[in-house]
Amino acid sequence: MSETDAGAPGAPEAAEGQAPGIRILAQFIRDLSFENPRAPDALRAAQTQPQIDLGVEMNARGREDGLFEVDLKLSARATRDDGALFVVELLYGGVFQIAGVPAEDLEPVLLIECPRYLFPFARRIIADVTAEGGFPPFMLDPIDFAGVYAARKAQEQEQVGHA
């Protein structure tokens, strides 16, 4: 699910008077996969809209240089009654420098705000690759990363309660 290392060497400490800040130092595709198992038959117009299952995961980890790597994993599977139309998976990453954020607030910044910065770029990649696969561009709706984070934390708490 999510992994953070708030105690990484060089992790930012909230200095008095220092304004919180997030700098994106790099963005990159870590992994990209597109499957079009029924091409070209699946490309014909159909009477029914496909069912699309969407998956979202966010992960973060501290690096030794005091920076943080954040990964946003998006997966989408489009199906109709007669089977899969396409499957796309993207693992999009970024390297962030975080300043002026107290340690107790670092995890939400890494798993909510940083993915929020990465999302428009990842969304565009998925739209482009589905269009290149012969389908209309798949434009992801905006994602409520705070809601996803809260749901994951609740699930983690539930698992701890059952352990």
Curated annotation (Swiss-Prot):
One of its GO terms (cellular component) is cytoplasm. Disulfide bonds: none annotated. Its main location: cytoplasm. GO terms for molecular function: unfolded protein binding. One of the proteins required for the normal export of preproteins out of the cell cytoplasm. It is a molecular chaperone that binds to a subset of precursor proteins, maintaining them in a translocation-competent state. It also specifically binds to its receptor SecA. Belongs to the SecB family. This is Protein-export protein SecB.
